[in-house]
Amino acid sequence: MSIFQLLARDGAARRGTIRLPRGTVQTPAFMPVGTYGTVKAMSPEELKTLGAEIILGNTFHLFLRPGLEVISAVGGLHRMMHWDRPILTDSGGFQVFSLGALRKLTEAGVQFRAPTDGHMVFLGPEESMQIQAALGSDIAMVFDECTPHPASYEEARVSMELSLRWAARSHAAYAGPGELFGIVQGGMYADLRRRSLAGLQRLDFPGLAIGGLSVGESKVEMMQVLDDLMPHMPADRPRYLMGVGTPEDLVEGVRRGVDMFDCVMPTRNARNGWLFTRDGVLKLRNARYEKDVLPPDPACACYTCQNYSRAYLRHLQRSHEILGARLNTLHNLHYYQELMAGLREAIAAGRLDAYADDFYRRRRAGSLVGA
């Protein structure tokens, strides 16, 4: 039985649910990123209040610090984090890809020096599956190679075929409590993406992700990959666009049939003083906000906007106060969760195009863009 239930469609966009043992996730969904077992500056209770039903943990970083021995000793990742809802863990493939020349790639896997202390580490499909099983992931991801950009056709083909072989090994090795998703690779090449998808479908994964995007390609290239690939994705499985992205990326991904997203953008930008609003991005360091008594977004119902001014948040940002990072993060995650809720409601009502038109109209007309 599929873990995905389709509730409504509007064009290619889907409104549905993903049923997991620790809870049901309403889709389209955005997953806040908790790299080291914490969504930076947020408590689990705050995440729940904001509407987060699933978060992302990072296999690579958690394996290196605090390590599986510590996580197992305290009862697993959920108990350690005090989070009783679903967690998706990535496989570590993207982080290994990010090491560049510091890694040695073979058919068996990847050898690299740990950025924490320099000791040699080997990570392959079997090791990644063992780690994710020990973490107790509700959704684990196959170990893959993130195809670099730009890549020639031959480079993308070789990388994609390696990822398919690793997917088969991941599938055979995984014995965790959760679901295991496959990852479509193939760079910017439509036929390679379709070949990757076909190979993954033969392994019958309960969900499929689109990897290898948001790695330096243009927005036009990203959307072209989705336009080529999404019509071929199975309708009865959740579809996860990895590491993407901006509010515009979320709207366009949903319009093309994506169900799940994750990105560090709302939390990272919050720490840098960039706040997402319905009218664009508010950059707190701009001197125009020095004496501004308005909240970041007067129409926003989040705790930050209900209680604090742009002037105060700017002061906290310039003073490097921890409270500023917390208030900014709370606002940005509220914005992202509200955006997803609005998209879900629009799909259910059959008015997604009107919702998207209003989204872009407000951002074009807003006085905050580039501020």
Swiss-Prot record:
Please list the reactions this protein catalyses: 7-aminomethyl-7-carbaguanine + guanosine(34) in tRNA = 7-aminomethyl-7-carbaguanosine(34) in tRNA + guanine
BP-aspect Gene Ontology terms:
queuosine biosynthetic process; tRNA wobble guanine modification; tRNA-guanine transglycosylation
- List ligand-binding residues for substrate: D90, S91, G92, G93, F94, D144, Q185, G212
Q: Which cofactors are required for activity?
A: Zn(2+)
Q: So what EC number does this one have?
A: 2.4.2.29
**What interactions and quaternary structure are annotated?**
Homodimer. Within each dimer, one monomer is responsible for RNA recognition and catalysis, while the other monomer binds to the replacement base PreQ1.
Note how many cofactor molecules are bound and how: Binds 1 zinc ion per subunit.
Region (RNA binding): which ranges?
A: 243-249, 267-271
* Pathway per the UniProt entry: tRNA modification; tRNA-queuosine biosynthesis
Regarding protein family, the annotation reads: Belongs to the queuine tRNA-ribosyltransferase family.
Report the GO terms under cellular component.
cytosol
Q: What does this protein do?
A: Catalyzes the base-exchange of a guanine (G) residue with the queuine precursor 7-aminomethyl-7-deazaguanine (PreQ1) at position 34 (anticodon wobble position) in tRNAs with GU(N) anticodons (tRNA-Asp, -Asn, -His and -Tyr). Catalysis occurs through a double-displacement mechanism. The nucleophile active site attacks the C1' of nucleotide 34 to detach the guanine base from the RNA, forming a covalent enzyme-RNA intermediate. The proton acceptor active site deprotonates the incoming PreQ1, allowing a nucleophilic attack on the C1' of the ribose to form the product.
The residues that hold Zn(2+) are C300, C302, C305, H331
What residues sit in the active site?
Answer: D90, D262
Highest taxon listed in the record's lineage: Bacteria
Q: What is this protein identified as? A: Queuine tRNA-ribosyltransferase
The species this protein belongs to is Acidithiobacillus ferrooxidans (strain ATCC 23270 / DSM 14882 / CIP 104768 / NCIMB 8455)
Disulfide feature: none
Q: For this UniProt record, give its keywords in alphabetical order, as a comma-separated list.
A: Glycosyltransferase, Metal-binding, Queuosine biosynthesis, Transferase, tRNA processing, Zinc
PANTHER family reported for this sequence: QUEUINE TRNA-RIBOSYLTRANSFERASE (PTHR46499:SF1)
